[in-house]
Amino acid sequence: MSAIKNLGLKIFSPMLLLLIFFSCDDKKPENTGSKNPNDIIFIRYSDIGGELGNYKIIKITKDSIQLETGITNNKTHKEWKSSINSQVWNQLTSTIDVKTLDKIKSSPSKQSVDGFDETFQIKTVKKYHVYVNAYADTIYYKQLQKLKDQIQNILPTEYK
């Protein structure tokens, strides 16, 4: 019986140390230059799934936009990057009401049945918001749809 306790202790101790190590977070907050905790500092939109492993990932910051798209099955991958100006950034972020972001509801993933998952990630100075298949939320999704439409307007035609 003492051997079992010893083995359990041998497994438990390193796990506890790893847990403590990973829970210590000494990251400093990002310096965004903004004093408003509701200012948006990062947007990510992705559409991933399907039988062939299609993906489109768009990352947007105040000064740049980056797109990755491809099909995993065919091993095709394309990337596009561009700088954006403050007018474009303001146009994108104006579609989002930060006060209602917590009210948006996600839906279950559809990738397990060869469906696509649409994911939005919006980071403010204060909080990080993630939504998966939020289009089922008929009340608050409208702002994400407007954001998606604005993003599509920025992309070159070969990536739409």
Describe these PLM feature segments.
Residues 68-103:
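A short-motif feature that recognizes glycine-rich, charge-decorated loops
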Residues 16, 35-37, 52, 59, ...:
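A generic structural signal for short, solvent-exposed coil/turn residues
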Residues 1-22:
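Sec-dependent bacterial lipoprotein signal peptides
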